[in-house]
């Protein structure tokens, strides 16, 4: 039972990673803002990976890491 739960969680993490890579590629094709999106996507994926490895809740880990590294999620509104 635990092995199947771990496999499904790993599959979900792989799907999320694949989606983020596709989104970063499409964002990079849009222009200079794409470079920022690509870096932000990598940062979020790194935080997600660390939270997964440490078995922590992602929002809690993101807030703590953001405060420590002074990283802010900024959205450009047009």
Curated annotation (Swiss-Prot):
Superkingdom of source: Eukaryota
InterPro entries: SMIM10
Protein's name in the database: Small integral membrane protein 10-like protein 2A
Species annotation: Homo sapiens (Human)
Gene expressing this chain: SMIM10L2A
